[in-house]
């Protein structure tokens, strides 16, 4: 994957899960200097933090798209809480609407087909070739020739393909920032600080980072309006 064989491949309606676990990129993928690095192997998942079923795309720097953007904040929070970790583990289910049993049934129905041909009914050809590579099986191999272990590994890759996220894009390319003044320290009715009287916060000053889709700008407008109104009223009160 480090040779960018998946660059530009887009996936529709996949399920991306962020795990409470460190990703472990292969030696070759560690050499890639992107913010998000596809990995061959990852540590065993322990607890799922969040799952988003949307579109995603492999890019020149790693991976992106609606599902990844929604997961990115959780990845950054996990990495911040685990400074000793080099990356955070994500997995992708390429066919979330199908169970492994259903995938197996479809495969058995076409067991005489070449593995590449079979995989192309579920994923784009370039991704299918990567899956064959991960299995160590030639693309033209008939599905019926796979061993039980290879079939089991295939379904694991199809439903939990591991990716290691080492971080997000730099601030100038971000959609929203995280961090700031804790909302627990602000009166939500007035946006006034609970610690310093007469000090009001709004927008990016607050530790609010919602999903893309207008939520962040709405939060900025609403908190800005409230903070502005109550700051003005507070000023009038102080003037007597």
What role is predicted for each listed range?
Residues 1-145:
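An anion/pyrophosphate-binding glycine-rich loop and adjacent beta-alpha core
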Residues 27, 238-240:
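Short, basic, low-complexity termini and linkers enriched in Ser/Thr/Gly/Pro
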Residues 56-61, 199-201, 224:
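Short hydrophobic core segments
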Residues 65-68, 76, 182-183, 206, ...:
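Short, flexible micro-motifs
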Residues 69, 152-155, 159, 222-232:
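Predominant activation on well-ordered alpha-helical scaffold segments within soluble catalytic domains
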Residues 89, 115-121, 166, 184-185, ...:
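Domain-scale detector for complete catalytic domains at protein termini or as standalone homologs
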Residues 129-209:
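A glycine-rich dinucleotide-binding beta-alpha-beta segment and adjacent secondary-structure elements
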Residues 208-238:
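A conserved FAD-binding loop/helix module that cradles the flavin
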């Amino acid at each position: 994957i480090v040779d960018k064989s998946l660059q530009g491949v887009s996936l529709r309606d996949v399920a991306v899960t962020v795990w409470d676990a460190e990703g472990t990129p292969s030696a070759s993928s560690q050499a890639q200097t992107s913010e998000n690095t596809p990995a061959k192997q990852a540590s065993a998942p322990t607890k799922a933090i969040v799952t988003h079923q949307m579109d995603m795309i492999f890019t020149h720097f790693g991976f992106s798209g609606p599902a990844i953007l929604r997961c990115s904040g959780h990845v950054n929070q996990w990495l911040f809480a685990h400074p000793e970790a080099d990356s955070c583990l994500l997995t992708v289910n390429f066919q979330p609407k199908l169970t492994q049993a259903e995938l197996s049934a479809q495969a058995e129905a076409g067991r005489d087909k070449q593995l590449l041909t079979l995989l192309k009914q579920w994923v784009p050809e370039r991704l299918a070739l990567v899956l064959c590579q991960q299995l160590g099986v030639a693309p033209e191999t008939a599905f019926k020739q796979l061993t039980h272990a290879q079939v089991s590994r295939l379904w694991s890759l199809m439903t939990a393909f591991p990716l290691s996220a080492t971080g997000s894009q730099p601030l100038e390319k971000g959609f929203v920032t995280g961090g700031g003044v804790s909302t627990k320290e602000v009166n939500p009715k007035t946006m006034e600080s609970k610690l310093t009287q007469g000090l009001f916060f709004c927008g990016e000053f607050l530790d609010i980072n919602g999903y893309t889709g207008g939520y962040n700008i709405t939060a900025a407008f609403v908190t800005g309006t409230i903070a502005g109104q109550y700051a003005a009223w507070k000023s009038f009160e102080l003037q007597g």
